[in-house]
Amino acid sequence: MQQITDLERTKILQNGGEKVKPTFSKEEMTRRNTRLREYMAKAGIDAVMFTSYHNINYYSDFLYTSFNRSYALVVTQDKHVTVSANIDAGMPWRRSFDENIVYTDWKRDNFLYAVKKVLNEGGFSSGRLGVENDHMTLDLRRQVQDALPNTELVDVSQAVMGHRMFKSDEEIDLIKNGARIADIGGAAVVEAIREGVPEYEVALHGTEAMVREIARTYPHAELRDTWIWFQSGINTDGAHNWATSRKLQRGDILSLNCFPMIAGYYTALERTLFLEEVSDRHLELWEINCKVHRRGLELIKPGARCMDIAAELNEIYREHDLLANRTFGYGHSFGVLSHYYGREAGLELREDIETVLEPGMVVSMEPMIMIPEGEPGAGGYREHDILVISENGTENITKFPFGPEHNIIKK
């Protein structure tokens, strides 16, 4: 009689399917992995074991769903294999750029058994193994070290983040489509705004519009993770506040935040709006924030330092005694990221980031101030555009208008 312990620990599971149409060309994915392997050779790293959503997706075109299971992408000079859980069956192979191996649930250490098997097949039994210190847990690190005792674990997270910060033409095309779809979501949000409508209904209407357009534009893609934060009144105080059942009221400050997700890539549209009317103090604060936004758009160009952009914009807020009302940095890089993975922290418009803007980078301008509840003009004010930096300057790929001339919504 067959026992659970008799079942195989790993398997190659294609399930009779074929590879799906990839997000990017073979040439693009080869370029990314060639650059990775060149870095590995230069740094004396024999193999890399990626564990994060963003790096596995960036180098393999497969975005996993963890549900407390482990996933990996193992890369050597000769092997490129995603390691996925049996619960996903053949989907990871269909979506992976290269090979895939499945580990089963039947023994607790099957994940590392599969990783070790791939490494051994790639000629690695000892040496320097690249890992992501900013993602790998202490428990997993200990388990890897126990499974590979003659291995030195070397952090590669910062180096590969530097690779991801520069976008290829294919990536920029996808990001431009994302910005276009975010604008569609924004228009749908405005369409749904009415006094008495709850926040979540507005968010749902915009999300549906974006998902449908992603499906139309990328019929081969998984449809996942697209969302909207739509906030009203006091709920606008935090940029990352989720929709609630609060019903919109006349005179409300509103915050529209649309995030279409395409194959793990993030784009965004964020706008301040008012319902029907705006008080004098609200209008004054809104116009100040728009002034900062406009100046920020002018400052983003090749050769500018992130910290210098932040410093100049701080002066505008300081002139109006609003510097202390800022809530976060002025912008960040775009690419493979979401609210639960990614973030290219080396490319953010903050006072402590010395990075110089270069062609191939894609960044946002998104100033925000928050006035506490109970004070005149209370609420959160935020505008957000996406800019592509090239040899010739910058291109603003966000088309949705901002400011009082456009976004006092009258129904």
Curated annotation (Swiss-Prot):
SUPFAM superfamilies: Creatinase/aminopeptidase, Creatinase/prolidase N-terminal domain. GO terms for molecular function: creatinase activity. Induction: By choline chloride. The keyword Lipid biosynthesis does not apply. Keywords: Hydrolase. Homodimer. Its EC number is 3.5.3.3. Signal peptide: none annotated. The active site is at H240. InterPro entries: Creatin/AminoP/Spt16_N, Creatinase/aminopeptidase-like, Creatinase_C, Creatinase_N, Pept_M24, Peptidase_M24B. It is an enzyme of class 3 (hydrolase). Belongs to the peptidase M24 family. Creatinase subfamily. It catalyses: creatine + H2O = sarcosine + urea. It comes from the Bacteria. This is Creatinase. Gene3D superfamilies: Creatinase/methionine aminopeptidase superfamily (3.90.230.10), Creatinase/prolidase N-terminal domain (3.40.350.10).
